[in-house]
Amino acid sequence: MEPDVIPAKNLVFGSGPECPTELLCLPLLRARYGLTFKEFRVTDAGGPRTVDALEAGEIQVGVLFTTDPRLLAGDFVLLEDDRHAQPAESVTPILRDELRAAHGEHLAASIDALSAELTTERLAELNRRVLLGASAAAVAAEFLTKRRHGLTPPTPRRNQPAIVVGSANFAESVTVAELYAHALAGAGFLVERRLGIGNRDTYFPLLRDGTVGLVPEYVGSLLAYLDGSRGSISDPPQAHAVLAQALQGTGLVALQPAPAQNKNGIVVTASTAAHYGLTKISDLGRAIGEPDGNG
């Protein structure tokens, strides 16, 4: 291979039809990494058409979400976002403040302990099991049993309002909501479920008005929803601090975020990664044989 070959210029990029103009897709790769690809082909936004196109060699670079269970098999390589272009998307519980006041800090502590265990890889594995046909409730119960969150003898909690756990209408959100519900029930709280409500425009007003008390969220996406100008922070602790500030006066509070993040991931096949020596996104714009600047 000639040493001046720039991988991106030889590779076809595929994603959903909005990618050429979506700020977090091709425009971000151009602005932060200076990448120009040989061609763009429409597939889908992190779904099966992208996977099929990668496997068939119709595209060599695509976008999958970082908690996609198909990243666990080893057929694809998730390139490191070494310039921190993508916003933080930590999985973050959003709770009605009145519930925290009514139930005390034990409620938040029960969810925080769970969140601390929820890594990107573990969430991808939960997603894999649901994709293979297991119920979200069963997957959540097994996860918590193994880690014993909320499964020690609970303290009876009488005369306190039920905690209504809600979720968006996609599988991962339902699974994380089931984790919350099982953790709280195991800790002695009365729990009701309202899962698969709809998109953020549908479920977030229900959280605001108290119909729902707790939902899983993604910090960057929620910040963009609340205030688009603040939805592009890549550092998770900073993003959480800004979200906490944005929620002041709303009656809502962001509990501790999980290490798990579900954000756009730039993916190549393992064979493409090996051929060009790709481990991080900046490698796509670096001439083969050129030092990477890290030593």
Regions found by a protein language model. Give the residues of each.
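Periplasmic-binding protein-like
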Residues: D44, T67-S115, A241, G249-V253, ...
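Ligand-binding cleft/hinge of the Venus flytrap
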Residues: E2-F40, E142, Y180-G188, I281-G295
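Short helix-initiation/N-cap motifs at beta->coil->alpha
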Residues: P17, K38-D52, E192-P205
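A conserved helix-loop-strand patch within extracytoplasmic ligand-binding domains
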Residues: M1-V12, R96-R100, S115-T120, P237-G295
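Short, well-ordered beta-strand elements
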Residues: A8-S15, R158-S173, F189-R194, D292-G295
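An extracytoplasmic/periplasmic, membrane-proximal ligand-sensing/linker region
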Residues: E18-L28, L35, S90, E105-I163, ...
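Extracytoplasmic small-molecule ligand-binding "clamshell" domains
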Residues: E172-Y218
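A ligand-binding cleft/hinge motif common to bilobed small-molecule-binding domains
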Residues: D52-L79, P216-L243
